[in-house]
Amino acid sequence: MANLLKTVVTGCSCPFLSNLGSCKVLPGKKNFLRAFHTHRILWCKAPVKPGIPYKQLTVGVPKEIFQNEKRVALSPAGVQALVKQGFNVVVESGAGEASKFSDDHYRAAGAQIQGAKEVLASDLVVKVRAPMLNPTLGIHEADLLKTSGTLISFIYPAQNPDLLNKLSKRNTTVLAMDQVPRVTIAQGYDALSSMANIAGYKAVVLAANHFGRFFTGQITAAGKVPPAKILIVGGGVAGLASAGAAKSMGAIVRGFDTRAAALEQFKSLGAEPLEVDLKESGEGQGGYAKEMSKEFIEAEMKLFAQQCKEVDILISTALIPGKKAPILFNKEMIESMKEGSVVVDLAAEAGGNFETTKPGELYVHKGITHIGYTDLPSRMATQASTLYSNNITKLLKAISPDKDNFYFEVKDDFDFGTMGHVIRGTVVMKDGQVIFPAPTPKNIPQGAPVKQKTVAELEAEKAATITPFRKTMTSASVYTAGLTGILGLGIAAPNLAFSQMVTTFGLAGIVGYHTVWGVTPALHSPLMSVTNAISGLTAVGGLVLMGGHLYPSTTSQGLAALATFISSVNIAGGFLVTQRMLDMFKRPTDPPEYNYLYLLPAGTFVGGYLASLYSGYNIEQIMYLGSGLCCVGALAGLSTQGTARLGNALGMIGVAGGLAATLGGLKPCPELLAQMSGAMALGGTIGLTIAKRIQISDLPQLVAAFHSLVGLAAVLTCIAEYIIEYPHFATDAAANLTKIVAYLGTYIGGVTFSGSLVAYGKLQGILKSAPLLLPGRHLLNAGLLAASVGGIIPFMMDPSFTTGITCLGSVSALSAVMGVTLTAAIGGADMPVVITVLNSYSGWALCAEGFLLNNNLLTIVGALIGSSGAILSYIMCVAMNRSLANVILGGYGTTSTAGGKPMEISGTHTEINLDNAIDMIREANSIIITPGYGLCAAKAQYPIADLVKMLSEQGKKVRFGIHPVAGRMPGQLNVLLAEAGVPYDIVLEMDEINHDFPDTDLVLVIGANDTVNSAAQEDPNSIIAGMPVLEVWKSKQVIVMKRSLGVGYAAVDNPIFYKPNTAMLLGDAKKTCDALQAKVRESYQK
């Protein structure tokens, strides 16, 4: 049956059977139906391909007849490509001779050699120049084209309407090579760019040939030869080709264009981009520049006039599609050039950019050589023909990708950047109908957004607006205010003792300023700890005011005893914690130390004083001087690791000498001395116990707690001093000064006390670390400040004791509340600044005690601590690019934040597992680890230290990069790493290591976010804009170890998570570090 059916089908002449395909015959599936379903086959038709088979088409390559035209449309290689595709190719005899392609080359490639008429009658004719009158044949080339044939050539349809009319009469389909859209997909067929590239290169070669000097500068025995200066106008393909060629020949190259992108390309080639002062975008359509405004052109002319007097060679390429080339250089400009200069006008064919250009000619005008050739590509005919041939063959394959038939479809509905766009833009005539210009494509991409200026650029612009006068005036105003204040203090001084105390305070502040700046950042934590211990000299104030016998007998004496007790906690605990931290920085290779020998100067200092006291000498002031100098030495000793332990020893000596001199000056009775000793001994024992048990990771909260003790001691001392001195106020000339200092010291101490307690609660986890933003908190704080300041009025005006003690009690309460509201509004990540500010407050409170008691030691030490805390606060704020007021008032945003909409982050992140991370670590030779607070919170320093040790033993260069505000107090991460045994010489600060990231194979970011956030540099609208950060993204590979992709404290998305060189290793930091350590150890043991 099947054979019968095939016979019927084969012999049937019925039309619906004529295209019968060889489909499979399908039998029925039910047993009782034994028929075949033949109707499916009877109606099946094979698809018919559109177009004409390549083997039926002939491509003709005529000889170019335009004057001096040496190019040919197809090279032998191009012919070979078309023959391989299936085309028949005929070439006019001698068509390629001027391009060094002989007829034999074409024959070898598979072409036939024929006459002009036969070639032009081909189905598809490819040319360089548009058809023109053939003088030899006496007929126009368009009239020799085959009816309904196809022409591919440069046409310039807007300038040649008569030619289009001739071609229309022949029903020709025309593809204009000059109309190929300048889109990414069409770069391989962009003949204009190919020819412009050659023209740009040739322009430099011709200029060098007619210029009388070297392009490159030389210093020879015969003398110095300056380099040639070249200005290139127009940053298109030709201009950039000229810039590259001229730069490679050693010339000084300058480039000008109205388009910002073109100027960037000039810069990338090593040329100096020139701009006018007027900002206006020159971006036009199709990759060309647009016509500019009158104001811009005037500024442009001014720039060109100036450049003409400086440069040796001018090359101009400026064109506007479909219009005459603009005149950019007038006659006066050209004549202002140095004799022997050269100008090359690549726009000569369109009229030229120079007023003095003669298109197609080379001539000299008043000593200036003018090159106005219109056939520069033709002067490199072989290269130009090869590139043009490649453009045509690629275009033919692209528009007709079918392997068998030549066919392309012209559509008026097409998307931007597609082949439909290329075909519709290139075809200017279809079957004799002019369809030029092409309609606007759909989905036209928006122009590139204006490049957002970086934070550094905006800062530079901002700095540039500050004139030298304004800068100097600001500086002069500061000095004027300072000197005026000093004069005011002198006038207000009640006695000589006050003036001497101000002198001591000023000099101590200057010494402290210069001393603290010398402290290495790695030792900022020990610095704060030692200043905390030294601030315990508030005990001196307590000792001076203590009284009674074995027990205090009055309220003031009780307050003084309590101040002495809590100050002693600070002294003992502070020095022991400092010693513990410094011992952690010791390396196994360090030489042995014999610090116990510093007992010798300590014994000499204190013992010598006791001996002199026993001998009847009163040298307390000299002892205070010696103690103060030792405290200065304590801070100075922390400038290096080698002298840090000496600094701690000097601090102990200074405090011990100060306490001894105080006791010696007081000469207490045995009972009172026992009371004093008991208070200090009990406080010291408690301080030592706390310091011995505290974990180093809990150091920030310990420092905060100790600061609260200093603040409380200052409040107690000031109130006690007021109570004791009150009976003498009526006869004391300095009574008002004493009252002012007592009031001020109480206020500072109250803020320090409560603020430190809140900071302790946040750091210890008792309170939430998130900022507590009370409604109207700024008004509340302003009210508290006004009430505190206003309270001094009745305090000074009313001489009664009740009013005075009430005012002191009120300011104590108000300042304590203000300390709470201020500190509660500050988030946990800003605690480094809070602690340093509180450290500074404690110093100023100590200064207030010094003025109150007329004690030089307290004034000197207070100035040291106050300046130390102030400088550390400044360092922290600079590290965040924020003002101190912004941090203290619980604000957000840096001083560089522009205030606009933040940059949107797009893209996807890459996640890896432990095995991937191990592979990356093993392959890297240079590794930088950048830890953040997450390392502290997870206590992952020990596995990281072990990992670093293993990697170092394998010969890898491993270092740490520490941000100044990483952690919860200055230098905390340095101490934690030292605790784990990491050598301090591989732990570098941000400024020391930032320049090394580009040469680093791998960066491990552990628990850090804001401190490595690239938005600080990339987004001027980010609230962390301008904040100095560790530039980890500049390394070759980055592994970020975090719990999640969540934001950091600043609540800013981090762009580095989505950068192509970043991999996210998500999970708990401690567990991940332990696993990394174990895996690395396992991999190296195999």
From Swiss-Prot:
- Which reaction is the catalytic activity of this chain? NAD(+) + NADPH + H(+)(in) = NADH + NADP(+) + H(+)(out)
So which stretches are on the Cytoplasmic side? 723-739
The organism encoding this protein is Ovis aries
NCBIfam families given in the database record = pntA, PRK09424.1
For this entry, list what GO says about its biological process: NADPH regeneration
Instruction: Specify the enzyme's EC class, one word.
Output: translocase
The record's subcellular locations are: Mitochondrion inner membrane
Q: State the protein's name.
A: NAD(P) transhydrogenase, mitochondrial
Instruction: Give the GO cellular component terms, alphabetically.
Output: mitochondrial inner membrane
Among the GO molecular function terms of this UniProt record, one is:
proton-translocating NAD(P)+ transhydrogenase activity
